[in-house]
Amino acid sequence: MNKPFGFIIFFIYLIASQLIAGCTIQPSEQSDIDVLQKHVEWLAHDDRLGRLSGSFGEADAANYISDYFAQTGLEPLGRAGTYLQQFTLTGEISEAMGVMNNRSRNVLGAIRGEEFPERYIVLGAHYDGQGRGGVISMNTEDRDVIHPSADDNASGTAVMMVLAERFAAEPAQVTILFAAFSGEEQGMLGSKHFTEEFLDGSVSAFGMINLDMVGRMTDNEVSIHGTESGNRWSDILSRINTDSLDVQIVSSRLGTSDHVPFHDAGIPAIHYHTGMHDDYHTDRDTAEKLNFSGMVKVADHAEKLIRELAREDPESFQFRQMNRRPNPVIEPGTPTLGVLPDYMFRGNGMRIDEVTSGDRADLAGLQPGDIIKSLNGMTVTNIFDYMNALESISENDSVELQYQRNEQLSTVTISF
């Protein structure tokens, strides 16, 4: 082979190799995917019985996370030199689920900061699930079945565990406190207990990042809620968003997860979330439906955020009180249309993201992208109006629903 021709072939080979490499999963990413899948499959296995707070399945999961923290080298921050912080389950949901006054536990560990060990950033995720569903199930038929709770929230727990390993290998300037909360499904009981008992003045956190439902990424999109809780969140996020993620900043809505008690305690707190889906709070929320490659992207982004936040001066990172709005969650027993709201929509009305086949909205001809403008005589300007309108409907009612499709308004009658 002559040299010029050989050089051309070699050059083409190099270019092709780079193109192929850019389209394949790198070894480090594949390793993270394997670890995430292992954690989720273990946590969401039927042997855990849905990880209901106060149950044997939840205790089993707590021990699993504790063992992982120990193997990873985290400092135990629970009671008596353990990783466990126990608390008692209370409230209406705990009573309805049959675990009233049962003991539950958070799992707490830390990687000390190399420069400012007295400064804390909290990275949290709730590891409890919906157990056998019951009053918190969104199943349309049998509610008394195991709810694997894979996306909600084995996904966030697994990402937190992977990040614990990363920070153990390369600590940040400040201490990172890793908190696996329980009792979230009963009203954020674990995170409330943590903020009341642990953050009691002797320990001060200047920022909190919550990972809840981060396993169903589509179109490289992730939303971050609660950025108005701190004066520097938006600036920090703008500096780190250099990858392919489409980050949706939901600044005006705090959300409803374990970052809320931190906000209420005066700590800037945000929430990573990859979106709602039809399997939410059902027995269909299973491990094989998760986007593990997307979860690696969430982990990468959250790591960048934490390392950037660790460089901030806590004195300049100031808390901002956000307005608390009613939770955009359908109460158990409320009649439903069989639609999934588009939580990213900022226009006037409630835009439909998904329609459940065979349910009321589907039978009435509604489609994804339709914008509900009124329901049961009540104007719908946002998701909160929509929830209130649903709660005004009783069984056997027939109500009118007005919706917009391609700038055209239409009205249908729906029977409940």
Where are these regions (language model features)?
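Extracytoplasmic/secreted proteins, especially bacterial periplasmic and envelope-associated proteins
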Residues: 31, 35-38, 42, 56-71, ...
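C-terminal recognition in membrane/secretory proteostasis and scaffolding
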Residues: 289, 310-416
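Second-shell loop/turn segments in exported
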Residues: 26-29, 46-56, 94-98, 142-153, ...
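His/Asp/Glu-rich mid-to-C-terminal helical/loop segments that flank catalytic regions of hydrolases
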Residues: 278-324
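Alpha-helical metal-binding/catalytic segments enriched in His/Glu/Asp
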Residues: 109, 123-128, 134-188, 302
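Metal-dependent peptidase/peptidase-like ectodomains
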Residues: 116, 181-277, 291-295
